[in-house]
UniProtKB/Swiss-Prot annotation:
Expressed in which tissues: Only in skeletal muscle and heart. Also expressed in white and brown adipose tissues. Is more expressed in glycolytic than in oxidative skeletal muscles.
Induction annotation: Up-regulated by beta3-adrenergic stimulation, starvation, glucocorticoids and leptin.
Main localization, broad class: mitochondrion
Residue ranges that the UniProt entry lists as topological domain Mitochondrial intermembrane: 1-10, 100-119, 201-217, 295-312
Gene that produces this protein: UCP3
Subunit (UniProt): Interacts with HAX1; the interaction is direct and calcium-dependent.
Protein name: Putative mitochondrial transporter UCP3
Length: 312
């Protein structure tokens, strides 16, 4: 990322991986209820949810969370958290931790700065690579977030836990079931990574170049918030298709394209922006928490590295 002084020790690959994964997990802990609310709003209106929808209707972000707490218990907004943390450790560490390295690969030799095209290519590449590794965890996370359990009984729960979900999906739908929705997810995360990481990179660079802010919390906050807004605007349509397709039972949709066509036919084009508000609240707050934490972790780990190399 931009903003490091020449005298600073550049972070190693291990520092970037650990810092990005840890910061993303912390951000998930803070914002996970917003993500769950987004998933519930995105799948509301599907054919398979009609019967349940007669009992439960979600209205707005806060209303969705309060309805879940009232009907399913206080822990329900955190359904799928374990899979979510597994996802971030394997996902964010790649898409964010590898971004600088891939950007350097695409940057022509002798160039002082990376162009916008170079940054977009790097964002698309690391986003797609991350999905390849983390897709099963994303499928399980979405299944848990989408499942509705009315009452305290566990008898209506399809999965008893995260590991049981992996086993059950593989047994009932085949190993391919764990990779369901990989194509729309690659599209979604390539777009999100470009809008998120590239926007953060450019905003931070410009704020520092024009001396509007120093390389500290306010700069990181503004850059991260702008990145979250851009990511939400461009990724919401793909995100809705991804969520519905991954949550669907076998046979409901033939492909992500079929899912998209049925959405337009049954609910109109506005269905692509269902759950936009929680998506923005979640991505905006997630980006702020993640990037601020990531910058501080990198700074702390680099100081430790400098002390090790020159203890006196």
């Amino acid at each position: 990322m931009v903003g490091l002084k020449p005298s600073d020790v550049p972070p190693t690959m291990a520092v970037k991986f650990l810092g990005a994964g840890t910061a993303a997990c912390f951000a998930d802990l803070v914002t996970f209820p917003l993500d769950t609310a987004k998933v519930r709003l995105q799948i509301q209106g599907e054919n398979q949810a009609v019967q349940t929808a007669r009992l439960v209707q979600y209205r707005g972000v806060l209303g969705t969370i309060l309805t879940m707490v009232r009907t399913e218990g206080p822990c329900s907004p955190y359904n799928g958290l374990v899979a979510g943390l597994q996802r971030q450790m394997s996902f964010a560490s790649i898409r964010i931790g590898l971004y600088d390295s891939v950007k350097q690969v695409y940057t022509p030799k002798g160039a002082d700065n990376s162009s916008l095209t170079t940054r977009i290519l790097a964002g698309c590449t690391t986003g797609a690579m991350a999905v390849t590794c983390a897709q099963p965890t994303d499928v399980v996370k979405v299944r848990f977030q989408a499942s509705i359990h009315l009452g305290p009984s566990r008898s209506d729960r399809k999965y008893s836990g995260t590991m049981d979900a992996y086993r059950t999906i593989a047994r009932e739908e085949g190993v391919r079931g764990l990779w369901k929705g990989t194509l729309p997810n690659i599209m979604r995360n390539a777009i999100v990574n470009c809008a998120e990481v590239v926007t953060y990179d450019i905003l931070k660079e410009k704020l520092l170049d024009y001396h509007l802010l120093t390389d500290n919390f306010p700069c990181h906050f503004v850059s991260a918030f702008g990145a979250g807004f851009c990511a939400t605007v461009v990724a919401s349509p793909v995100d809705v298709v991804k969520t519905r397709y991954m949550n669907s039972p076998p046979g409901q949709y033939f492909s992500p394209l079929d899912c998209m066509i049925k959405m337009v036919a049954q609910e109109g084009p506005t269905a692509f922006y269902k759950g936009f508000t929680p998506s923005f609240l979640r991505l905006g707050s997630w980006n702020v928490v993640m990037f601020v934490t990531y910058e501080q972790l990198k700074r702390a780990l680099m100081k430790v590295q400098m002390l090790r190399e020159s203890p006196f």
